[in-house]
Amino acid sequence: MPILRETGCLFIVSAVESLDDSVLDRLDKNHTRADFFRVVENCFRTGVTLQPTFVPFTPWTTMESCLDLFEQLHRLDLVEAVAPIQLGIRLLIPAGSKLLELDEVRKLVGPFDAKALVYPWKNSNPAVDTLSDELQEIAAASEHLKRSRKATFERMWRATKLAADQIVEEKSASVLPSRAAVPFLNEPWYC
């Protein structure tokens, strides 16, 4: 990592996908939640910005895992490093996906949608699918309105807490401290 920084590397985009080890195992990512935490620490220590990407909505997503993602990004001071759209992305299962080799996936997908080029699926908790749609809408509206990543994250975290039936305190002040802008790509859909 120090060599990356010394040679001018400003940031690293990493396809983390999930902080849930059972999901990471199904996706065959070859890393764990603990590995991600170590990488975050190494990046902060060397001064290279980490821009993790995620696919937070999978057939195995729970409200608890959604809340955990927001809590960890806040705790790790990664709010400004994550494009808001990354917090609403749904797993796509195209033809030929290795996921289709899993019995549990074959049982949960619908017939192939030739127009969308995917096998559609639904979460066992319809509220999780509704939350994914809501977070995508918040991200799109925030992009259109030029809201900061921090302000958008706060809206998305609030929506997630409400969807999980958690009490949300009304505050006039921001729950997140301001932070200098981090370098990032102008196309936030990388995953």
Protein language model annotation of sequence segments:
Residues 8, 24, 36-39, 43, ...:
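Solvent-exposed, non-transmembrane amphipathic alpha-helical segments
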Residues 38-50, 76-81, 130-131, 135-145:
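A structural motif corresponding to the C-terminal end of an alpha-helix
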Residues 47-53, 69-70, 110-116, 134:
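Short acidic (Asp/Glu) and glycine-rich catalytic loops that position anionic groups and cofactors
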Residues 22-27, 56-65, 79-121, 126:
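Flexible glycine/acidic-rich beta-alpha junction loops that bind and position SAM and/or redox cofactors
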Residues 21-25, 51-55, 141, 170-175:
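Glycine- and acidic
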Residues 1-48, 55-76:
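Conserved non-cysteine loop/helix-boundary elements of the Radical SAM core domain that shape
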Residues 2, 9, 77, 82, ...:
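Homeobox/homeodomain signature
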Residues 98-100, 104-191:
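Radical SAM enzyme core and accessory elements
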